[in-house]
Amino acid sequence: MTANDERRKSIDFSEPYAKTGLAILAAKDAPVQSVTDLQAPGRKVVVRLGTTGESWARQNLPKAEIKALDLDTSCVMEVVNGNVDAWVYDQISIMNYQSKHPEKTRALLAPLREESWAVGLRQGDEAKKSLVNETLARMRKDGSFARLADQFMAKERDMMKQQGLPFVFELP
């Protein structure tokens, strides 16, 4: 889950296990090449309700018409059907949905904002937090994250590298 200040009010987080960013799934024919284009008056942007993409869009796209929906698939179909210019969501999801609809969409993966994913934990449970952090550190050190990426996310890793972007498990 994305670790952010709003969520920190009610839960604690482990150390990050991944870094990602918000990206754009644009309709193939929409006049959108970057975030600057989304800031133009009259742009239609869909977001998933309750996500960091929604909060980012509401803060950064004051001239856009923002539509919040409950499901990823509903957001994708708004783009595919040409009802909106773009969807703001995480890079990995944007890549996956674009690959399912290449004839109707484009993925703009340069991050609008970088985010960290971490394990959410009950506030104050330092023992569990320490255990989770130790496990994550061990997985980084022994190559577990790299093996998981090879097995389950090779396409996404390669696509990000082709665009000169760091892969989500490549933490500094």
Each language-model region and where it sits:
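Acidic, polar ligand-binding/catalytic clefts
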Residues: 1-39, 105-106, 110-112
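A ligand-binding cleft/hinge motif common to bilobed small-molecule-binding domains
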Residues: 1-10, 55-56, 80-113
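Short beta-strand->loop
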Residues: 12-18, 65-67, 99, 103-113, ...
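Bilobed "Venus flytrap"/periplasmic-binding protein-like clamshell domains
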Residues: 19-77, 91-95
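A bilobed periplasmic-binding-protein/Venus flytrap-type ligand-binding module shared by bacterial periplasmic
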Residues: 23-32, 116-135
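Hydrophobic residues within well-ordered alpha-helices
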Residues: 38, 78-80, 119, 132
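Ligand-binding clefts/hinges and TM-proximal coupling segments of bilobed small-molecule sensing domains
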Residues: 52-67, 136-172
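Short amphipathic alpha-helical coupling segments at ligand-binding clamshell hinges
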Residues: 90, 124-138, 144-148
